[in-house]
Structures are given as structure tokens and as C-alpha cells.
Amino acid sequence: MSKSARVATVIILVLLGATLLPLAPSSVGSDPVIRMSVTTDRYVYPLTGELEVTVSVTNLEVQTLEGLTINSTVYDSSNNLVMVLPDVSDVSVGALSTTNFNVSAAYSLSDANYVIVSDAMVNGTRVGSANVPLVVLNTAGRAPLTLAMVFHMHQPIYLNLQGEFEQPWVQVHTGGDFEYNGTWYGAYQWHVLMLEDHPGIKVTYNLQPSLLYQWNDSLLDFKYNGSFPSEEAPLSHDLTAINETVDGYRSLAASGQIEILTSPFYHPLSAILVELGWSSDLLAQIQLGKNYTDSYMGVNATGMWTPEMGFTMGMVPIMQEAGIQYTVLDQANHFVGAQGPGANSSVYQPFELNGTNGSHIIVFFRDTEISDELTSTWNSIPNPRVAASDFIAAVANVYRSSPGGVLTLASDGENPLLSDGVISALDWNAIFGAIASQSWLQTSTLGSIVSSRPVTAKLTFVPDGSWSGGFGLWIGAQPKTAIWQAIEKDRAILVNLTARYGADNIEIKKLWNYLYIAEGSDWEWQTPQGSPWFAMQAYRYANAATQYQAPPNVYQVNSTPPSQYSTYAVGIGGVVVLAVVCLILARRRRP
């Protein structure tokens, strides 16, 4: 979709700006078509006070809506009526316009979440309805809830072997996803701007090493081979946005407002590598990713984002060996089924997970439901204050049950901002603002929690799994299995080539790098339902060693295979990395 088309779509959506789907188009004498939203003057209320409600009504008809009455009521979680607000009677809304109606009343309610429901009535017939949470909270004697937000930013490498970009999405998603107030922004840049607007908010980010590399490559030597439409080609604006975005994340990290995690460089599904007996490959990718993250961003990353949250217990000693101290897994698919002394305790805390041979890491389990709502529901509500109210209501429930606890929310960071353009961006900005306004809610990075909070809950086992449950999205079905079989064949050949020519040979290092690319999770995700290009790329890099022909009389023969191959990727440096290519991340929405 061109930028002009995207602008038109955004304008239409913003003009509609409501939370209720319209009724069927009206004819003469039928119910009017309206949209409604309800907001409150505060996100959280004390036990007694004054409640102020604003009901926004948008008339989508070409004639004035007259004789409108608005009834507003309050219900508890069991759908019991607990309060009736004053009616707004016999009002009108102009054609194709929006009017706000204010209602206020004194209240006295217990500590709980309620819902305000506003119904629009014409001649005794309901023609529209909307609702919003009403959070009544007693904070006396309760320790604040710590909120740890973790966002994963990932793009695969879109470079071909000549170092040319074949896809524009690194540049577009940094500087060209949506237009706001006459300026184009991308998801990655918007996160920086939100944090600059809310300096009290602390967030943890995984900036995938393959994304960092492409930011760097774009700034140093951008090359475009013409393989995608010229209208999507990165403009000078997008490259400027990359420069500002990189500087922004570096500055935020230096100030302590954000923490930057690392990840295995090419986003492999780590558990599969371990189960296939390729633990040294995982170690190599973690070390390569950490080295690049640390050097490019000026940090010392001690936490790791586990790609796709794909986990198996065999990863614990590997992560510890690579210098990783903590990671994030899923409540529904990992904490449920965990074993150990802490298995029956609250999920709202960090856990020590003990592996083999004395190894251990710290695990934060994300709240699955709230994380999913944040990225799939509260990013597509035309009224940002409603989105923020919904978020605060969900977090307030956790605060009531676990004051002083740690609520971990973890999700993709760019995808939620791509679903509805500027609507998504404004929703999340409102949520950040709502968080900043709550004294009972404090934000923290994972590293700060680890360094300041004793970890007392211990686990001895976490079940295999990913955010989706198992690993079937990446392995199992024949088209996916065939790719893994090609990788397995190529790896066996590469082991023999390494034994013959030596682990330090630059060509051998390059081949291992290509193999690590083939191990990335993006290939299988899009096979077979996606474009054939994904499978083509997978086999191209899975067959790199198979098709390799070494020049004669160049390499020294080494008949003794090294004991492991984790050192092949470590310290490869920019020269070799410049030659690599990866897949389009299948889950990234294309503009």
C-alpha cells in the first residue's frame, strides 16, 4: 500500500474515532447510525468522591440526530447494578459531527473494578451503547506493584550476498509506518519518542542483533538493488529516522531509562537447536549476538530474549556459559507445569531456575493475557483514553492480588504499532501516560529488579514450549521438516570441511555464518503458507556448505576436528557479517 493510501486510511479511521461498531445503514424512519465512546476524568478513583463521565456521540448520518437521551449505569463484575448516573435528556447531535455530553455524580464504592455502560436512546429504542472500566482502588497499606515491560524488536537481514537491500522494512518500520501531524514515523522511532515524552517510564527492549546490524549498514553504506517498488524505497527521511532512533536508544540506555537485552543473532528457535544436539550453534549465536549488542549499543547485556519464547531445560547451562543471567518465558505455556519449591507460588515475581551441573538462570514469566491484550486489543481502539482505561483496569486486578509483586508484560514491540497506524501509536502513548500517572504502579527494567530484589522462589523444571504452546509452527509438518533435513545435511558436511581446512579459515567461518542464518526461525514460520521466496532462501543457505568448492592449494589440511564449533561465529567481525543474508520475518505486517 502506498503512503498516500495509508494516509487516507488513517484519516478515515481517525474521523470515525469511536469504540462501537455502527448499526446497519439507516433509511427513512430507521434507527440512526451513530458511534459512541465513554471516558472518565480519572483512570483510578478512591473509595468515595465525585465521578465525572464523558459520553462522546458521533452522528454518521447526513441529518441532525434529535430527541436523544443517554442513560448511564454502573455494574459490578457480576453484572449487578450498583449505581445509576443522571440522564442526559432530549439532546441533539449535528449531521456528521461529534458531541460530548458530561455526566457527574457522587459515589461511594468498595475496592473493585466496575463498568460504566452508557446507552443512547431515541423514542425509547436503544440506538447505540458503549462502556468503560471504572477502577476503584484502595492503596492504603499496599506496596506498589512493579511493572516490567519488555518489548521485542526484530527484523531479519534483508541483504543479498552483494550487500544490497532487497526489502525495505528495516527502513520503513523505523521512519515510515504512519503519518502524524504531518510527519512520518516508524514503530521503532515511536518507542523512543514515547519514552522521551514519559521520562519516568522504564522499559526493557530486545533490539535483535540482526536489526542493529541493518541499522548500522543503512547508515554506513546503504545499497538498494531495485527489487522492491520504488515508492517503498527508503527515503532520506527514513535514514535520518534510523540515525535519530539509534541515538535515542543509546541515550535512553545510558540514562538508565531502558535496558537493552540481547538475543541469538539470527533468531533461531533455540530449543530446537538443543534438541537436535546442536548446542554449540546456540552458544555461538548467543555469543555473537551479545558481542554485537554490547559493542554497537554501548551496553553490557546480561539478559536475553529467547526467540519465540522457545525453551527447553537444556538451554540453562548454555545461557549461563554465554554470560546470560535472566530471560522471559510465558505464564500459560511455561509456568503452568513448572516444578520445584516455587511452582505453587505467585507468578508475579522472578524465579531462579536450576539446570544441570549447578547451572541456573533467573526467569520472569510474562502475564500471558495482559500481554496479548496489549498487543492485539488495546492497540486498535480509536479513543486512546479508552485503551488506557482498559489497560489500567487489568493491571489494577493484579495489584489487588499481588501488591509488591512484579508484573511482567512481554511482546513484540513493532507489530502492535503496525496494525492500525497512528491509532495504535496513540493508544500506546496514552497507556504510557496512564502508567506514569499512577503512584501505586512503578516501572522497572529486568536488570534493576534482578540487582535490587532477592530471588527466593526456585524452580527445578520448566516444560518445553513456546509462546504458541509447542514447536509445530517451526518443525513437524513435511515442508518445514524438509528444511531442517537440508540444514542437518549441510551441517554434517560443514563439520568435515572444518576438520579439513581449519576452524580459523575465513571461508569456513563464513559457511558457519550461513548455516546459522539457515537455523533462523523465520524460514519455517512462513513455509508452506507464505511466498515461495522464503523456502527458496532457506534452501539456498541450508545448502551453502553442500555446494561449496574450496579452491585448490589454498587451505592447510587439518585432519583433527575441533571438539566444538561455538568459536566459529565469535569475533567474525563486520567483514564477514556484511556478506550475510536472512529472511523476511514472516510475522511482520507489510505496509
Language-model segments: what does each one mean?
Residues 1-33, 55, 72, 557-591:
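Secretory targeting signatures
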Residues 43-49:
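Short, solvent-exposed loop/linker segments at the N-terminal edge
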Residues 57-61:
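Asparagine-centered strand-capping/turn motif at beta-strand->loop junctions
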Residues 63-68, 82:
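Short acidic/proline- and small/hydrophobic-mixed sequence motifs that coincide with surface turns
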Residues 106-111:
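Short, surface-exposed loop/turn segments at beta-strand-coil junctions that are enriched for proline
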Residues 140-200, 210-212, 217-220, 224-232, ...:
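Active-site and substrate-binding clefts of carbohydrate-active enzymes
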Residues 209-306, 359-379, 408, 413, ...:
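Metal-dependent polysaccharide deacetylase catalytic core of the NodB/CE4 family, i.e.
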Residues 281-344, 415-438:
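Catalytic domains of cell-wall/extracellular-matrix polysaccharide-remodeling enzymes
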